[in-house]
Structure formats: C-alpha cells, structure tokens
C-alpha cells in the first residue's frame, strides 16, 4: 500500500510539473506571434500630389514610390490635378485608410490646416513635400533652398544681360514656393533696379503655373511694351514654355532671355535648341528618395532631425534642405544627361547632329 501511495504521489507531482512547463512554453509562443504580426505589418503611406498632369510631379511620384516600396512600405497615391477642393477631399479619403504617415505636395500652402489637424488627431504624422504647409503642426518639410533657386535664375540672366527691360513672371500666387523664388530673384535684381540699370516693365503671377495662362500674360506684356522686353524671369519651365510661345509669334525666341525651373524635357530641349536660356535642376530623385526615407521614419514613430528649421506661422518645422543646380546649354551633358534624368537622344532629337555635343 505504501508503494502504491508513493507511486500515486510521484505521478501527481510529474503531472503538475508537465502542466507548469506547458504553460511556460505557451506564453512565450503567444507573445512571439504578436511580435511577428507587428513586424510583418506593412507600413502604409499616403502621397497627395498636387498635379500629375505636370511632368515634374510624375518623376517625383515614381522615385518616391520606388524608394518607399524598397523600404517595405505600401504607398497610396492620389493626384488632385490642380484642384484645391479635390486635394482636401482626397486627403480625407486617404486618412480613412489606416495610414501610418501622410506626405503632401500642396496646391495651396495656406488651405490645409484642417486636414493636417485631422491627421494629427488620428496619429498620422504629416510631411510637407517640396512646398511648405503654413499654419499647421506638420512633422517635417523636405525641399530645396527655394530662395536660392530664385537667386540662381536671376544671377544667370543678369550675368548675360545686366541692364535693360525685365518682365517678372511669377508662379501660382497660392504656392509658398513661388513667393520664395521671387524673394531670391529680387535679392539679385533689386540692386540693379535701384541703380537704374534694370527697369521692371511688368510683374504678374501665373495661376496654377499654367502654360496657357503664361502665354496670355506674355502676349499682353509684349503688346503693352511694344515688344521691348529684354529678359523674362519665368519661375518654372511650364510658364517659360507658355511665354516662349508668345515670343515665338513675335519672332523674339532666342533674342529675349528667359529662365525656368524643374528641367522638364521640353525645357531642356528648348535650351539645347537655343530657345530657352536656362533652368534650375532640382535633382528629383534626391528629394523623392529623401522624402520617402523621412516618411518611413515618421511612420515608425522615429524622430526626424535636421540642420535647420523653417517657421510656418505656427511652429519651427524641421527642414531637410537640398541643393539646386543651375543648368544652361553648356551644362546639360554633365548634369541632366550624366544623372540620366533625360536621355541624350530625347534632349537633342531636334538638334542637327553636327551641332550636338
């Protein structure tokens, strides 16, 4: 009997030990499964693009999506095609899709406060891409030194034509960058205006950066000044393209200096052909990939650091600032072609082979 009692006791102890071991083994397994679910969850980033009908933003989208996907994120892209109300609606729609971060290329820098507040309320950090968003608590801003862009445009033109009649063709009046470009342009031009060397014979902003609007503005400016314009300070390539159509109708292409920005293919072709004087190349791959990297950081809840900040009327926003590049006819090969931004064949397709570099 004693032997049977002892055996029963040993069996009970063994069962208790096995039961305890089973509980210990199952608890970590459950915890590991949760960690696995978290680590395997793909980050979701919303990219609100101002206008994909413009070539410039198509490049940005492609580079951004490629980099974000390489880093393991899913990207939802929507384009407002220049419509402010549509951009607001699209952003609200994206916020309903469980985003981890939101990246906005703003149409109107001053109209996004409400949707940024909504994003913040839902725990979705907002990154301003290329265009600063004013009056809102955004997490970061990635762009080029836009004042420097304007300075580069004016410097290039002033070096070639330090006196004469200048017409200022600004960008969209609702785009904060357009104002920064103008600030940079006037840093260079104003001293020459003050000295009497340069006369500003017109100054207009171009709604939505629209080429057709720029064409009309330039036609009216030429009429008002009896074609006596030496330089057009156009703030981007799209507006430059519209202005050049008006100049062409008056036989002034290649005679009137004109700036641009973005290094659109059509603009680089015009520069190669001698129709446009210069553009400012903002390496799109650089801003797109950097923005994707910053968006991933924000999506993971990581802090973004920067060397400088910019005040948007509410906070000092961490500003990741990139350097632009001035491009004239002699610079195309070692910038645009070297970076494979456009191909040699595309750029020089309208230039006789004997005149190609």
Positions of PLM-derived features:
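C-terminal motif of bacterial Sec signal peptides marking the signal peptidase cleavage site
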Residues: 17-20
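Bacterial N-terminal signal peptides that target proteins for export
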Residues: 1-8
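Short, surface-exposed loop and linker segments with low hydrophobicity and enrichment for Pro/Ser/Thr
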Residues: 8-9, 232
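A residue-level marker of the well-folded mature domains of exported/periplasmic proteins
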Residues: 3, 22-357
């Amino acid at each position: 009997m004693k032997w049977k009692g002892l055996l029963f006791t040993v069996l009970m102890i063994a069962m208790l030990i096995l039961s305890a071991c089973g509980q210990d083994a199952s608890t970590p397994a459950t915890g590991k499964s949760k960690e696995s679910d978290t680590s395997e969850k793909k980050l979701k980033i919303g990219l609100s693009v101002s206008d994909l009908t413009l070539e410039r933003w198509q490049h940005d989208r492609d580079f951004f999506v490629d980099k974000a996907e390489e880093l393991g994120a899913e990207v939802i892209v929507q384009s407002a095609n220049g419509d402010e109300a549509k951009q607001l609606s699209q952003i609200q729609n994206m916020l309903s899709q469980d985003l981890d971060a939101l990246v906005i290329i703003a149409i109107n820098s001053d109209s996004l406060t409400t949707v940024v507040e909504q994003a913040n309320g839902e725990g979705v950090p907002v990154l301003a891409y290329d265009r600063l968003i004013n009056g809102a608590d955004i997490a970061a801003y990635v762009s080029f030194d836009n004042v420097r862009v304007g300075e580069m445009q004016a410097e290039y033109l002033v070096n070639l034509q330090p006196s004469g009649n200048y017409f200022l063709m600004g960008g969209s009046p609702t785009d904060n960058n357009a104002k920064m470009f103008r600030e940079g342009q006037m840093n260079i031009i104003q001293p020459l205006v003050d000295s009497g060397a340069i006369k500003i014979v017109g100054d207009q902003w171009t709604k939505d950066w629209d080429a057709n609007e720029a064409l009309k503005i330039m036609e009216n400016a030429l009429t008002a000044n009896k074609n006596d314009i030496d330089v057009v300070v156009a703030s981007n390539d799209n507006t430059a393209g519209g202005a050049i159509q008006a100049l062409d109708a008056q036989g002034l292409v290649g005679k009137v200096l004109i700036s641009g920005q973005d290094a659109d293919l059509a603009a680089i072709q015009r520069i190669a052909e001698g129709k446009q004087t210069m553009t400012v190349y903002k390496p799109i791959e650089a801003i797109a990939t950097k923005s994707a990297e910053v968006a991933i950081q924000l999506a993971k809840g990581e802090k973004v650091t920067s060397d400088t900040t910019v005040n948007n009327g509410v906070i000092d926003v961490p500003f990741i600032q990139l350097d632009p590049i001035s491009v004239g006819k002699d610079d195309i090969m070692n910038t645009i072609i070297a970076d494979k931004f456009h191909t040699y064949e595309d750029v020089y397709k309208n230039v006789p082979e004997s005149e190609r570099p």
